[in-house]
A protein has these predicted regions:
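Short, aliphatic-rich beta-strand segments
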Residues: 1-6, 159-161
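Thiamine diphosphate
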Residues: 15-23
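C-terminal catalytic domains of large/alpha subunits in multi-subunit enzymes
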Residues: 22-285
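Adenylate-forming
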Residues: 10-13
């Protein structure tokens, strides 16, 4: 069993799952699978490790780097514990699929469990921290496409289809990344067409801080959404991963605005693009 303590507070982005999957990948030589990793969910500012914040699409790729550094120390420690058993230096041994063997004589081998359970069982505890490499970036590449219909009599815009493409390097958690892509389109759709805080012109007090007057898109407003993940560019992370969060909605408003322009022939750059703005642009009000 591996206890992984990297107390970043999960906000729904899937970074915890990325950490577990990345840890299992790094410890694959020990025969570790995700099911054998116990995630430490306890976050206490008195005792917990200091970790990176949930921002800038950086958690998964930054933590994958430090996990890889810690894993190298685990490998070294395991091989050093095997030295008195195999009577050879640690550099003369290797670990594959949970078995330790002598390179010159692969038949001379034992499982990692057999080696670690001899004598007193002393857990291997590794604590590592690592500063982000300022020379590398975790920023992804992305693109959006939108198909819309515009009623030129009422000014109503219907978004029929959205395609979001993210090249975020190696995808560590595919279903989580796709969920972020879809969520980004929902937020981008609202930002472009309906969401707006209205202030009292005299007092500056917000007038629509509620879920009735602040118009968030509902399921009934959702178009067909196609999330596409590419793995062409290799980012800053240990596995060639990089962030995805902010990049899921950055281009959505402009894609919808461009589609509206192609539909009515008039450019509107002021969002949200409500029906009255369409009619005003067409000279109908």
């Amino acid at each position: 069993t591996v206890i992984l303590d990297a107390p970043t507070v999960e906000t729904g982005t899937g970074s915890n799952t990325c950490n577990v999957l990345g840890c299992a990948e790094s410890l694959n030589f020990l025969g570790v699978t995700p099911e054998k990793i116990l995630w430490n969910h306890v976050v206490n500012t008195d005792t917990s490790l200091k970790d990176c914040v949930q921002t800038d699409s950086s958690v998964a790729y930054l933590q994958s780097e430090v996990i890889a550094v810690a894993v190298e120390e685990i490998r070294r420690e395991v091989l050093e514990r095997a030295e008195p058993i195999f009577k050879v230096k640690s550099e003369e041994m290797d670990i594959v699929d949970g078995r330790i063997f002598v390179r010159a004589n692969p038949d001379q081998s034992q499982t990692v469990k057999e080696v670690l359970f001899q004598g007193d069982l002393v857990p291997i505890v590794i604590t590592k921290s690592k500063l982000a490499n300022a020379q590398k970036t975790g920023v992804p590449y992305f693109a959006n496409f939108a198909e819309v219909e515009v009623d030129t009599d009422t000014g109503k815009v219907d978004v029929l289809h959205l395609v979001v493409i993210n090249d975020c390097g190696t995808v560590m958690f595919a279903s989580g990344a796709e969920a972020q892509q879809v969520g980004g389109q929902v937020m981008g759709l609202g930002e472009t067409l309906t969401e707006e805080i209205i202030y009292d012109e005299i007092t500056g007090v917000p007038l629509n801080f509620n879920f009735i007057d602040y118009k968030i898109p509902t399921m009934a407003d959702m178009p067909e959404i196609d999330p596409i993940l590419l793995e062409i560019w290799k980012g800053a992370g240990e596995y060639g991963a990089c962030g995805i969060g902010e990049g899921t909605l950055t281009c959505t408003p402009r894609a919808i605005m461009n589609a509206i322009y192609n539909a009515i022939g008039v450019r509107i750059n002021d969002i949200p693009i409500k029906p009255e703005k369409i009619l005003r642009a067409l000279g109908k009000v």
